[in-house]
Each structure stands twice: as C-alpha cells, then as structure tokens.
C-alpha cells in the first residue's frame, strides 16, 4: 500500500498529528493509500523562507524539502504541518500550499487556531480545521482544482469562516476526479 506522510514542522502537538492522520487515513486507506506520521522537522530548515517585514514564511519554499523527504521514504505524497504563518506572493496569507509536481504540501495552523481571532482555545475545532486544510491540500497534490461547491473541501477558503462552512470531504464531482487521478499514480 502506498503512503502519505504527515510531517510536523517545529512543535506541533502529538494529539493533533495523530487525530489528523487518523482522519485522513480513514478516507485514503479505502482508496489504497495509508497515512502515517513522519519524524518532526526543525523550523530552522526553512529560515530562508522568512520575510521579516511580513513576519511570515513563504509557503512554497517548504515544498521542495517536504518532497525530498517523501521521495526518500518512498511516499506517494508528503504534507507538512507547521505553526508558522504562511503567505504566497499576491496573498496576505494562506492556510496551506501544495504542488502536484512535487507531491508535497504544507498547512499552517497559525490562523486555524481560535486564539488567533481572540477566542478561547478549542482543540476539537483546531483538529476539524486542520483536517479540512490537509484534505484540501492533498486534493491539489492529486490534481484537483478549487471547487465552486461551498460545502466541498476543495472550495477555496478566503477566511477561516469559509473553512468552517465546508465539510472535510470531497463533493461527488471532486471525488470522481480524485479517484481517476489516484488510479494513474497508484
């Protein structure tokens, strides 16, 4: 069975990685792909991606390193989870970034945490949001684009409210495309 690696970058609570990996595995294992947690990476590997004026990291700069880790492990895809704030050129922030070519993605929990918005900490909500963003970025890794269905996990999240509205699953149209694309890579 092929593997998706979920790799913590910096300190990410073990329970978060475990719960996210279990959910993603519950979906992808039925499609011939298992999910496992990889060894933690130091944030210092990505210091060159830091933009001091913005106080954010360029998300795409994480992908080559994650891709190489996945390649060495024989993984089908690799997803990093970090607590640092991410951006991409032309955007104020991103929850995550993915590359189909590199078969890698990174998701930031920075803006997924309720505390970022002045709310009390809520581990269940953080897990739910992180699951949705990991499923979304994996969709991109496997060739899906954004979906107009606001309940589909592939819908673009312009804010955390958009993330909260959508479900952690692919809509029937995206599911069909994903299964077709997985047949090619498996």
Swiss-Prot record:
Keywords: Hydrolase, Metal-binding, Metalloprotease, Protease, Zinc. Its EC number is 3.4.-.-. It comes from the Archaea. Its cofactor is Zn(2+). The active site is at 137 (proton acceptor). Zn(2+) 1 binds at residues 136, 140, 146. It holds the Pfam family Peptidase_M54. The keyword Zinc applies. Transmembrane segments: none annotated. The keyword Zinc applies. Monomer. Belongs to the peptidase M54 family. Probable zinc metalloprotease whose natural substrate is unknown. This is Archaemetzincin. It comes from Thermococcus kodakarensis (strain ATCC BAA-918 / JCM 12380 / KOD1) (Pyrococcus kodakaraensis (strain KOD1)). The gene is amzA.
